[in-house]
């Protein structure tokens, strides 16, 4: 295995940079440029000056970590140098000169996975923590980072192992009287109980995913209903030109904001109506094409007008809110509807409805143990499907080997979630609890 090096901090001028070196020759290589002997001792901080021949590179602090008790599971050295990017690059260039290889993207985390320092769920959580868009996203990542999500998946696997093991024993040793026979009713109950737990984490994860990645919001309506005014109010700055002339917005304007601990990725669009203007029609077609590609649609209607049923037909199957703008135009309000005056920044009622629609309060007041990506959710949904297929086959009276085939594939998918080997000897685990051939 090669010894790798990379800048662990952002590639820009700052107060301090951290350069990470990992691999079997980490200490050997660092000692080629250190003016003092960096001993192979763990959890130590060393002050030294780095030199290449007679050229002084920098005055640094070096943190040392000895395998296997490191992030990567390998010998690990972290150099804390001054924050000039030129200085950091010079040190990295020198380390490469003396034997380091430039690290590939994510290679330190990959080595941590290969050396079983953490599972794939935790690895993905680290990346999500770095890219967290708001405090609620951080809260959702922490559950995975601390291993609570991995523990849940491990419990699913263990229960699955026990079920598969019992079935395998019945298939392979039918002649033994002391082997507990598979009871179809009990087996179905165990599978239903397992599926209930899996469904719960799928449902929670689906709810949380838009919050984690940012809620994609499409603002639509007829021309001059206040779409761009709402965008500017949400962003608290003029992102879009606002005039009294219908059709001012002709293209999609996108902006990302954090507001009340949620991230909104907002798309302001051209007003949807019949027009002979070629350019405006392009913008209208873009708006229509986005309808099924967002998490939420805000359909804006002036408070003194009725909704356009033809336009509503385009969005009614998607998650949406009807928002009545220019509330100052009416004297009475329907308590069941949302009224705003974006020109005066009177939009809190809309923000509150968005938070309610995406369960923000629910997540804000509880520990969040959720999957971190659509990929992970998709895998667990496949497990849910396979378990239900096994239950269906059980109810039809199919043979045990057909039922166990679905469950064994469930095991492969759960292993995929954790990034571990899919090889597992079920009988070895089961022999601890079964008395075979005594």
From Swiss-Prot:
GTP binds at residues 224-229, 243-249, 268-271. K(+) binds at residues 224, 243, 245, 248. Residues 214-359 form the TrmE-type G domain. Keywords: Cytoplasm, GTP-binding, Hydrolase, Magnesium, Metal-binding, Nucleotide-binding, Potassium, tRNA processing. One of its GO terms (molecular function) is GTP binding. Binds 1 potassium ion per subunit. It is found in: Cytoplasm. This is tRNA modification GTPase MnmE. It comes from Ureaplasma parvum serovar 3 (strain ATCC 700970).
């Amino acid at each position: 295995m090669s010894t790798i090096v990379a800048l662990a901090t952002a590639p820009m001028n700052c107060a301090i940079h951290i350069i990470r070196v990992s691999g079997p020759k980490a200490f050997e290589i660092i000692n080629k440029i250190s003016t003092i002997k960096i001993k192979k001792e763990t959890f130590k901080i060393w002050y030294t000056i780095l030199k290449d021949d007679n050229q002084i590179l920098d005055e640094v602090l070096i943190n040392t970590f000895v395998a296997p008790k490191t992030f990567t599971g390998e010998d690990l050295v972290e150099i804390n140098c001054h924050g000039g990017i030129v200085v950091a690059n010079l040190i990295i260039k020198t380390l490469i000169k003396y034997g380091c290889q430039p690290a590939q993207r994510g290679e330190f985390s990959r080595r941590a996975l290969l050396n079983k320092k953490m599972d794939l769920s935790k690895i993905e959580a680290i990346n999500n923590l770095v890219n967290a868009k708001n405090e609620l996203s951080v809260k959702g990542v922490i559950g995975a980072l601390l291993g609570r999500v991995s523990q849940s998946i491990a419990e699913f696997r263990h229960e699955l192992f026990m079920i598969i093991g019992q079935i395998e024993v019945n298939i392979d040793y039918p002649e033994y009287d002391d082997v507990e026979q598979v009871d179809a009713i009990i087996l179905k109950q165990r599978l239903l109980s397992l599926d209930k737990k899996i469904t719960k984490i799928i449902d929670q994860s689906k709810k949380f995913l838009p919050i984690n990645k940012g809620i994609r919001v499409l603002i639509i309506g007829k021309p001059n209903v206040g779409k761009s005014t709402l965008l500017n109010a949400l962003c608290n700055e003029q992102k879009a030109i606002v005039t009294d002339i219908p059709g001012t917005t002709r293209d999609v304007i996108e902006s990302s904001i954090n507001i009340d601990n949620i991230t909104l990725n907002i798309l302001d669009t051209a007003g949807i109506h019949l027009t002979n203007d070629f350019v405006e029609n392009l913008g209208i077609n873009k708006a229509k094409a986005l309808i099924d590609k967002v998490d939420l649609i805000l359909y804006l209607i002036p408070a003194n007008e009725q909704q356009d049923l033809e336009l509503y037909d385009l969005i009614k199957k998607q998650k949406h809110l009807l928002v009545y703008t220019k509330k100052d135009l009416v004297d009475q309000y329907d308590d069941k509807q949302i009224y705003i005056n974006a020109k005066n920044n009177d939009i809190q009622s809309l923000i509150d409805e968005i938070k309610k629609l995406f369960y923000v309060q629910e997540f804000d007041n509880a520990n969040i143990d959720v999957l971190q990506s659509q990929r992970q959710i998709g895998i667990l949904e496949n497990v849910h499907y396979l378990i239900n297929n096994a239950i269906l086959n059980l109810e039809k009276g199919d043979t045990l080997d057909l039922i166990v085939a679905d469950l064994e594939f469930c095991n492969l998918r759960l292993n995929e979630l954790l990034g571990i080997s899919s090889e597992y000897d079920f009988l070895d685990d089961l022999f601890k609890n079964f008395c075979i051939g005594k």
